[in-house]
């Protein structure tokens, strides 16, 4: 009972004050607006209000519209609010509708109405360009209109922030944004009379669907590429529209106009004006949506996307292609959306102002460029545009700076700790420069997620020519030098000099190096003639190596060198024939799988340089001379030839520096029996 007692006043308030006057001739539109958005109003105030008028405001964040009566009606409203406590309840309900204070949204009305001829049309947060406005009807006394999406309405509803009177007729000029200290008046898009007080504009509301993405670019001043062939916009324009007559027919199109009178250039890491814009450019500036003309029900049913709109600097493109919008480089532009009601035969009638509506979203401003200037914009395009592979592959060669200090990092940025699998691979400072660890893709360390730049994968900079580059598998013949990630001479996988313990040393290092192999990476099979064919992986078998008897490996004694390993050229040839993935590298395979303890390497003498020139590398590196398709990418090792051995891929200065520091002539044959003793006894 108490709950009903508390709710009944608010229910009665909603019934009394959520009514739209039936005296308005366009009742169908009012019902549609009432259905879509909550409107709080009184009905008796319409009788004594001056002729039809309305002021609305399109907001950028929390969108709402405040309708105010004429200034001469304000004392009456104050008196009625004193007499009736019900109105106070309405005011409280209206002020706390979205849980915000009233002073955040409600702006006081100017007591000195401006002249109708000088009141410009304004739009939050920038002044906008619209056609001449006309008096629209007022639903009643001070009320508020709450919308739950970013909304910028027609020019006829945007005079609140410019302090124009409710009866004001905003001029047709375009007050451009004042943030750079310039004011520029442009011509209206539609020329029609502004002296028809009986006509009422439509109440269409337009929502910018991908507004969060636009705002992210707008923070750094959006740039759009223009080419001779035409380049599509990204982000593209995508809208949702409501409030149209479902049975009427409309043309919806976009035009692109100059946003200010300046010519711009990128200097000192920011855009600065330099001279006046060229306003005498000829060319198409309008892009009609392919679905035009169509019914209001069609336009309101789905998202209206302009993804096929192309920007070009070819002035002759307008002669043969309606999809091209001709722009000039280094000029700032503002796209506008136009909704025009047409006749049944498709002809436009712009003599009636209610048929033409223009919508402008300031966050869609951009500067036309022939090449991206701001690296922040480049990074955002890489992160969000699925078709940015063209310059994503070459990003590290153009922009080699560190991306870790960017203001807008990619959501898929990997931390620096993922570049090196663990503390065991502590690198010298010269090997781990900032330009090599820039924004490395997470997918490179998780093969199950896919490493390619195809749709549906994490998109980031693959660093084709950078550090830890697995892209070499796609282009094994790339002539550019590779920067190989190698371990220091005293830190060869940090194997202990005393013993090889499966649980502590070998398994620990292998798990650190190949911690993601469980996602589907196969081990390198090491089968040869006379063996069982069971592959020897880099990990301990789940059943344990100790469970296998020595006779399993060709019946050899524990601690001795296995005869099935290729210690001769004939055995190497047999192994290469049995396993095509080894090929010419089978010759030094035994030495590859026998890392030396640091103590044993001191007194070793060189026996065969070809057997001693293998060094351990992280599994994410793909060897240049490898021909496999990536299945064994994480399992192969990189063979580094000595400095005096001429090889085709030894052109990297970084590699030569490393080889000079290492003693490449250490022999690992002494410890080979101890190495295989690990497989037999552990």
UniProtKB/Swiss-Prot annotation:
Superkingdom, natural source: Eukaryota
Primary site of residence: nucleus
Gene Ontology BP term (one): commitment of neuronal cell to specific neuron type in forebrain
Regions of compositional bias (Polar residues) in chain numbering: 58-68, 462-472
Region (Disordered): 43-83, 108-127, 447-483, 588-658
UniProt-listed PROSITE patterns: TBOX_1, TBOX_2, TBOX_3
Effect of residue 271 to R: In IDDAS; de novo variant; does not affect nuclear localization; no effect on transcriptional repression of FEZF2; does not affect homodimerization; does not affect interaction with FOXP2; does not affect interaction with BCL11A
Modified residues annotated as Phosphoserine in this record: 410, 594, 641
Record-level Gene Ontology MF annotations: chromatin DNA binding; DNA-binding transcription factor activity; DNA-binding transcription factor activity, RNA polymerase II-specific; protein kinase binding; RNA polymerase II cis-regulatory region sequence-specific DNA binding
DNA-binding region(s) in UniProt: 213-393
Phosphothreonine carried by residues: 408
Physiological role: Transcriptional repressor involved in multiple aspects of cortical development, including neuronal migration, laminar and areal identity, and axonal projection. As transcriptional repressor of FEZF2, it blocks the formation of the corticospinal (CS) tract from layer 6 projection neurons, thereby restricting the origin of CS axons specifically to layer 5 neurons.
Disulfide bonds: none
Protein name: T-box brain protein 1
Subcellular location: Nucleus
Comp. bias regions, Low complexity: 108-122, 619-629
Lineage: Eukaryota, Metazoa, Chordata, Craniata, Vertebrata
């Amino acid at each position: 009972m108490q709950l009903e007692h508390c709710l009944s006043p608010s229910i009665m308030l909603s019934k009394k004050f959520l009514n739209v006057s039936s005296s308005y001739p366009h009742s169908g539109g009012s019902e549609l607006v009432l259905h879509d958005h909550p409107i709080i109003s009184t009905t008796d105030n319409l009788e004594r209000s001056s002729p039809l008028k309305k002021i609305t405001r399109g907001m950028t964040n929390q969108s709402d519209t405040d309708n105010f009566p004429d200034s001469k009606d304000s004392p009456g409203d104050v008196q009625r609010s004193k007499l009736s406590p019900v109105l106070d309840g309405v005011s409280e309900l209206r002020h706390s509708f979205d849980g915000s204070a009233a002073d955040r949204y409600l702006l006081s009305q100017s007591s000195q109405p401006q002249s109708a001829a000088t009141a410009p049309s304004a739009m939050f947060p920038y002044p906008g360009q619209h056609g001449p406005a006309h008096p629209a009807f007022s639903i009643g006394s001070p009320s508020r209109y709450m919308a739950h999406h970013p909304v910028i309405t027609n020019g006829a509803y945007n005079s609140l922030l410019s302090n124009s009177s409710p009866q004001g007729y905003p001029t047709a000029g375009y007050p451009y944004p004042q943030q750079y200290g310039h004011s520029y008046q442009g011509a209206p898009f539609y020329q029609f009379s502004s002296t028809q007080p009986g006509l009422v504009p439509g109440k269409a509301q337009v929502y910018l669907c991908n507004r969060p993405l636009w705002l992210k670019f707008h923070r750094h001043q959006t740039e759009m590429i223009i080419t001779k062939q035409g380049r599509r916009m990204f982000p593209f324009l995508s809208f949702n529209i409501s409030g149209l007559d479902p049975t009427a027919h409309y043309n919806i199109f976009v035009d692109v106009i100059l946003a200010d009178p300046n010519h711009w250039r990128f200097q000192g890491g920011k855009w600065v004006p330099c001279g006046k814009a060229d306003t005498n450019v000829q060319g198409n500036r309008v892009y009609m949506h392919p679905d035009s003309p169509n019914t209001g029900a069609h336009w309101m049913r789905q998202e209206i996307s302009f993804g096929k709109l192309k920007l070009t600097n070819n002035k002759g493109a307008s002669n043969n292609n309606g999809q091209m919008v001709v722009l000039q480089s280094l000029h700032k532009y503002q796209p506008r959306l136009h909704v025009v009601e047409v006749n049944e035969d498709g002809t436009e009638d712009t003599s009636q102002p209610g048929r033409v509506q223009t919508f402008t979203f300031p966050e869609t401003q951009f500067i036309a460029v022939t090449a991206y200037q701001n690296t922040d914009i480049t990074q955002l395009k890489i992160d969000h545009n699925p078709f940015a592979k063209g310059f994503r592959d070459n990003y590290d060669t153009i922009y080699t700076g560190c991306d870790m200090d960017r203001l807008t990092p990619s959501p898929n940025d990997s931390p620096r700790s993922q570049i090196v699998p663990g503390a065991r691979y502590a690198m010298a400072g010269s090997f781990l420069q900032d330009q090599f660890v820039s924004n490395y893709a997470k997918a490179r360390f998780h093969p199950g997620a896919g490493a390619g730049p195809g749709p549906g994968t994490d998109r980031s900079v693959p660093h084709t020519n950078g550090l830890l580059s697995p892209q070499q598998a796609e282009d094994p013949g790339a002539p550019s030098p590779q920067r190989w990630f190698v371990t220091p001479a005293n830190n060869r996988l940090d194997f202990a000099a005393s013993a090889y313990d499966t649980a502590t040393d070998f398994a620990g290092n292998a798990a650190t190096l190949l911690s993601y192999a469980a996602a589907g990476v196969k081990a390198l099979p090491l089968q040869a003639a006379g063996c069982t064919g069971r592959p020897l992986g880099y990990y301990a078998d789940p059943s344990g190596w100790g469970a296998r008897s020595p006779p399993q490996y060709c019946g050899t004694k524990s601690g001795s060198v296995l005869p099935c390993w290729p210690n001769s050229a004939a055995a190497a040839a047999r192994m290469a024939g049995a396993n095509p993935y080894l090929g010419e590298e089978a010759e030094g395979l035994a030495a590859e799988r026998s890392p030396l303890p640091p103590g044993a390497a001191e007194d070793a003498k060189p026996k065969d340089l070809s057997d001693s020139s293998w060094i351990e590398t992280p599994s994410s590196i793909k060897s240049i001379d490898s021909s496999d398709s990536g299945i064994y990418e994480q399992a192969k090792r990189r063979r580094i030839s000595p400095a005096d051995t001429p090889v085709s891929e030894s052109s990297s200065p970084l590699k030569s520096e490393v080889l000079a520091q290492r003693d490449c002539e250490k022999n690992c044959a002494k410890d080979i029996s101890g190495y295989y003793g690990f497989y037999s006894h552990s």
